[in-house]
Amino acid sequence: MDGMPDAIAWRDVGSIDDIPPLGARVVVAPGGNIAVFRTGDDRIFAVDDRCPHKGGPLSQGIVHGARVTCPLHNWMVDLASGEAVAPDSGCTRTIPVRLDGRRILLSIQTGA
């Protein structure tokens, strides 16, 4: 180990048009599946595709506003923070995401 931090790379994972409004898409990544969400007002969020409660697939949940409801036990997760909405508690990892025109880019750590 040389003490150097891992490099950050932006990975193109498709077009915003590939995800319906209030929908999601799964991106397979080395660290596990990532759920990429599109809100009704075309905001894009990305989180680990695992509910902090029992590991349910958030990508199969219902998107409302900037939240998703897990399909297993109806936990709500804030897509911006990854935090479960009270009274539930827990957190799923968020992944930096940006739009370049209509292209969705995820920030993926790579070994430098």
PLM feature spans:
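Iron-sulfur (Fe-S) cluster-binding segments and ferredoxin-like electron-carrier domains
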Residues: 57-64, 75-86
